[in-house]
């Protein structure tokens, strides 16, 4: 996977966390930058670890499906992207409608884990491709840190307007990356 695809994947994977952070920021009255950074760090670390776990699980099965790797990555990314789009359109969310005014550590960890399950599944798909999983996981984690921190800070202003659109955009990006993987296999 080239650098631009890695960056697109990283920011595509961060959109769930961004949407969740907007929701979190929307429930806080004038959140401090330190709260935004704390949230970003929690989301970023978890989002870095989950693709590594998924990659490890995928490697266990790689000898059985190497000839199908492009299809596996494509199907996983289209499924995850489609799910994000459907959730964005329907208005479903991992976030509770009446989120607390103060966000405790375990609430943030639980939310971060819930939004990072997609990254774990992507990690499984990446096990079948020739990618640097550490570089990709770090890119996903850094993008998630940035987007989650930003989401908290602007959440109270744009939460009602952009929250679900961020999930839709993330889903479109994932489907695009899956299509690019499949196209690259057949084109070259």
Swiss-Prot record:
The chain crosses the membrane at residues 3-23, 41-61, 62-82, 107-129, 143-163, 168-188. Keywords: Cell inner membrane, Cell membrane, Ion transport, Manganese, Membrane, Transmembrane, Transmembrane helix, Transport. Pfam families: Mntp (PF02659). It is a multi-pass membrane protein. It is found in: Cell inner membrane. GO terms for cellular component: plasma membrane. Coiled coil: none annotated. InterPro entries: Mntp/YtaF, Put_MntP. GO terms for molecular function: manganese ion transmembrane transporter activity. Probably functions as a manganese efflux pump. Belongs to the MntP (TC 9.B.29) family. This is Putative manganese efflux pump MntP. The gene is mntP.
């Amino acid at each position: 996977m080239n650098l631009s695809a890695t960056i697109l994947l990283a920011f595509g994977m961060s959109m769930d966390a961004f949407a969740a952070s907007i929701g979190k920021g929307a429930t806080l009255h004038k959140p401090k930058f330190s709260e935004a950074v704390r949230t970003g760090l929690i989301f970023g670390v978890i989002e870095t670890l989950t693709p590594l776990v998924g990659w490890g699980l995928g490697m266990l099965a790689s000898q059985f499906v190497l000839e199908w790797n492009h299809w596996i990555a494509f199907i996983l990314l289209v499924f995850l992207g489609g799910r994000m789009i459907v959730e964005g359109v329907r208005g479903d969310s991992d976030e509770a409608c009446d989120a607390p005014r103060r966000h405790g550590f375990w609430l943030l960890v639980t939310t971060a884990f819930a939004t990072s399950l997609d990254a774990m599944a992507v990690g499984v798909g990446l096990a079948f491709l020739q990618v640097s999983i550490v570089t990709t996981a770090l890119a996903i984690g850094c993008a998630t840190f940035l987007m989650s921190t930003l989401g908290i800070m602007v959440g109270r202003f744009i939460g009602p307007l952009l929250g679900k659109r961020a999930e839709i955009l993330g889903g479109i990006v994932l489907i695009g990356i899956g299509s690019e993987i499949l196209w690259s296999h057949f084109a070259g």
